[in-house]
Structure formats: C-alpha cells, structure tokens
Amino acid sequence: KTEHYEMVLKAGDMERCLPKLAYHLEEPRVGQSYPNYYAAQLASKFVKVVLSGAGGDELFGGYPWRYYRAVVNNDFEHYVDKYYSFWQRLIPNTEIKNVFAPIWDDVKDVWTRDIFRDIFLTHKNELNTPEDYINHSLYFEAKTFLHGLLVVEDKISMSHSMETRVPFLDNDLVDFAMKCPVNLKLNNLTDVVRINENETGGKKKKYFQKTNDGKQILRNVMKNYVPNSIVKGQKQGFSSPDASWFKGESIDFVKTKLFNGHTPLYDYLDRDSVEKLVNQHLDGDVNRRLFIWSLLNFEECCHIYE
C-alpha cells in the first residue's frame, strides 16, 4: 500500500524558490529543478531516505523522440552533427557570438561541438545499423545528461537533510542495461527506419514527439503489478508550465530580473542580444523557456557569489 501526496505549484512558488535553489545547487543549471526542490521539501517532512527513479530513462531508452532524430545518418560525423543540433538549442547558432560579445575573446575558441564529439573518444564509433545510432545516443546521455540529473538530485535532497538512493544505477543493473538489445527498449525503431523521408510531417508527427514508446522492457516487467494506463502511458516529464508562466503570471518577474539596469548578467552577456531573444518568448513567437530559466539561474548565482 502507498500513500500519495499532492502539491500544487504556482508561478510565485518558482520565483520564491529561486534564491534558495541557486544557493544549494552552487552553480548555474540549464534544467529547471524547482519542482524537485518542492518534492524534496514535502518528502523531508516524513522520511530521511528516498528512492529515486533517476537513470531509468537514460539506461532503458526513455526519450525515443531524441534518439530517432539521428538514427538514419551516413557516418559518425554526420551523426554527431545531427544529435548535437538537438542539444545545442539554447541559443541559435547565429546569435552565439552576439550574446557572448562582452567575453567573446575568452570563449571564441571553445567549440562545444568538439566537446560533444569528444564524449565518444573511448567508445566504438562504427555505425553500421540503426541500433548503433541508438546505443550511441544512450551512451552519450548516460555519460552527460544523467550526471547533471544526479548532481541536482543529490544537492537538493541534502539541502533538506535527506539521502537519495538510485536503485536503477545498481552496478549489475547498469551492466545488464548496457548489454540489453535495443529492440527490448524501443518498439518503433523498425518503423522509423522504413518511413518515407519525403512524407510531409510524417516522421516528425509520429516519432519526434512523446509517445508510449520507450522503456519497453520495464513496461513488460511491471504490467502485472501496475495499472494498464501506466504500462501503456506516454512519457511524463517532471516539469512545470514555465513556458506559459514566463510570458504570463511571471512576466513582471522576468522583466525585473533580466531587463533592469543593475543586473550583473551583462558583464558577461550582451544586453540587446539577450533582450531580443527573451522578447521572442514573451511575445509568443518562440519558446525560449530554457534560455530564460538559464538566465534567471545565472543572474541569481551572480548575486550569491559576486
């Protein structure tokens, strides 16, 4: 038997949480993590040790719409370009030099594409089958994205005097997952490979959005223990509607933090370029929620550690 607790977060909760969150994380983070902060706050009222599901997605293919984008390319370098383009979406490539103008001389030789590529230096990079592309993506996310999640998980739980344990990252289970065939993780790979690339919108609509594909082996294992609606459910992220908050309830908060004349942000970033990108979101033209959250987080860190 389990007991379930519900906490409803509003835009103001994000605003109030930001100083404490930035302090405990000790460094700027791109991913929003205030829902995690409030979940830890609630759990700490009842327990001192919690179990986390971190690692389940990265080991068993929980983000198929990401992997499928780069699954039918010609070679390793093409694969890197395609997969990198998905991850490097915080700032448009055409705007990077403008945004970092105040410190451009210091960062112009830092090529994130090369850093991205170097993750695979110790990995076998022969890409002969669609499964090879998928395994490359899973390897990359386990080596990078997962590490960031674990940092947040650990620091936020410790800020509430709790310990988080991650059963999916048990050594034996990780070894098993790394050897597990792709067809036990993803159901739609065969269809993705065969789809007509010239079919208008077909691939994007079917496979680049959230579906009930992914983590198939976990779904099969648990089908006798949890409701069918969960076994066949779509991937549900642990996030809040900040995209709408930033241009709605929190619009004044965003403008006050990012558009004021005293923020230390613009010792490092170009004001006009940043404001242009932020306004694209506030005007409803482009979803730049991750960019705005990154700016808010960085701005708060500047105040804490200046």
What does each of the following model-derived ranges do?
Residues 19-23, 65-68, 245-247:
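Short low-complexity, flexible loop/linker segments enriched in glycine and/or proline
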Residues 60-86:
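A mobile, often basic/glycine-rich helix-loop segment
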Residues 1-24, 106-124:
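A conserved beta-strand->alpha-helix junction
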Residues 27-29, 208-209:
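Acceptor-substrate binding/catalytic loop of class I
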Residues 28-40, 79-85, 197, 260-265:
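Short, basic, helix/turn surface patches
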Residues 45, 49, 86-306:
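Adenosyl-5′-phosphate
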